[in-house]
């Protein structure tokens, strides 16, 4: 200790009892043991923030006894990139199996290159125990989301695919569910070249 200084410290305050964990991560790690996760990563590049999150998740999954595979591809058209990640080809039509049914896996995990996530978020989704689970995020304004729903089919034909982007408030007030529409359900105009 330096000459001439006196250290004064208060008695340490007793620690509060830790709150019970909201998620059972031990259960999630047991659930993933022996399973195969295919990471579907559409896009061309990622940030170091994404890379750190991704590598942390990969290490944690392998340490928990899971196998991982990576399917990554790029196209300037995002729907093509997603098809390519599944080993599909949009020119072969709608009735295709992921990777033509040749890849054995238990889970597909789609992560866009601009998403920041944690290992805990993966396990929270796994603990939902649903066939399909998803999350979404707000844009920079903190109110608008990337979630969009199509207008009625007639509006789609008239306006050429205008969507209503949802806000947190509009989602909370929504009375009807989002509608899933097969892409073969819509009739697209014929394009003629000259």
Where are each of the predicted segments found?
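Short beta-strand-to-loop acidic/aromatic patch adjacent to the donor-nucleotide binding site
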Residues: 96-116
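Single conserved hydrophobic/aromatic residue that forms the stacking wall/gate
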Residues: 185-194
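Short, flexible, basic/aromatic active-site loop/helix in glycosyltransferases
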Residues: 153-182
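Short, conserved alpha-helix that lines the donor NDP-sugar binding/gating region
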Residues: 78-101
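Conserved donor-nucleotide/metal-binding helix-loop-beta segment in metal-dependent transferases, i.e.
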Residues: 120-140
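Short beta-strand-to-loop element that shapes/binds the nucleotide-sugar donor at the catalytic cleft/hinge
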Residues: 134-152
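N-proximal low-complexity "stem/linker" segments adjacent to membrane-targeting elements
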Residues: 3-72
């Amino acid at each position: 200790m330096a000459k001439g200084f006196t250290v004064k410290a208060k008695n340490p305050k007793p620690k509060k009892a830790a709150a019970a964990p909201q998620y059972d991560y031990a259960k999630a790690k047991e659930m993933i043991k022996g399973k195969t996760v295919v990471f579907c990563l559409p896009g061309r590049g990622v940030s170091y923030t994404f890379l750190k999150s991704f590598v942390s998740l990969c290490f944690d999954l392998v340490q928990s006894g899971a196998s991982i595979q990576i399917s990554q591809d790029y196209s300037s058209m995002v729907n093509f990139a997603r098809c390519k990640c599944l080993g599909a080809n949009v020119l072969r039509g709608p009735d295709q199996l992921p990777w033509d049914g040749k890849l054995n896996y238990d889970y597909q995990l789609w992560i866009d290159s601009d998403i920041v996530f944690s290992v805990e978020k993966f396990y929270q989704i796994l603990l939902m125990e649903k066939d399909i689970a998803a999350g979404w995020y707000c844009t920079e304004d903190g109110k608008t989301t990337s979630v969009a729903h199509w207008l009625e089919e007639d509006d789609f034909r008239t306006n050429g695919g205008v969507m209503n982007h949802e806000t947190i408030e509009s989602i909370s007030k929504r009375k009807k569910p989002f509608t899933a529409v097969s892409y073969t359900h819509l009739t697209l105009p014929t394009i003629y070249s000259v």
